[in-house]
Amino acid sequence: MRNKPFYLLCAFLWLAVSHALAADSTITIRGYVRDNGCSVAAESTNFTVDLMENAAKQFNNIGATTPVVPFRILLSPCGNAVSAVKVGFTGVADSHNANLLALENTVSAASGLGIQLLNEQQNQIPLNAPSSALSWTTLTPGKPNTLNFYARLMATQVPVTAGHINATATFTLEYQ
């Protein structure tokens, strides 16, 4: 019985200390799961843009270009929450004009040229540009969407040397 006051004192101290160390804090976690962006249609995942045959003599000065060749990227389906997209192109930049896509350097390659990529309004799309430098293109939510682009050759040096035209670019999509 002599230990009873001791045990009561220990229990009282434990309750007092545990309440003194307790803190009332609340963490609220919020989020939102939105509808999907868009899927790139199979026909737009790996494709070739044919810039056709062009005569080296038509590139008589730096900046001379060929006629534009259209190509498209099909997004299907697009989610109901998506309203716009930014499309950026990345690849190896031409050493004389960083906004142009460089030609692959092979034995049979043409030289003195780069590939210019253009948007639907035929304004140049800067190669390897940060997202902040790209403009939004409006999409129709819940529907397939077609994004139209153009490509053409541009002289970066004269004279241009005849040969094969090959280059590779990757496109990236950012949705709003």
Swiss-Prot record:
Localization: Fimbrium
Cellular component annotations (GO), alphabetically ordered: pilus; pilus tip
Gene3D superfamilies in alphabetical order: Fimbrial-type adhesion domain (2.60.40.1090)
Site (Required for stability and transport): Y175
Keyword Transmembrane (UniProt): no
Key words, A-Z: Disulfide bond, Fimbrium, Signal
GO BP term, pick one: cell adhesion
Disulfide bonds: C38-C78
Keyword Signal in annotation: yes
Signal peptide (from-to): 1-20
Superkingdom of source: Bacteria
Entry-linked InterPro entries: Adhesion_dom_fimbrial, Adhesion_dom_fimbrial_sf, Adhesion_dom_sf, Bact_Fimbrial_Adh_Pro
A Pfam family that the UniProt record links to this protein: Fimbrial
Main location: other
Biological role stated in the UniProt entry: Involved in regulation of length and mediation of adhesion of type 1 fimbriae (but not necessary for the production of fimbriae). Involved in the integration of FimH in the fimbriae.
PANTHER family: FIMBRIAL SUBUNIT ELFA-RELATED, PROTEIN FIMF
UniProt record similarity statement: Belongs to the fimbrial protein family.
Name of the protein in its database record: Protein FimF
Originating organism: Escherichia coli (strain K12)
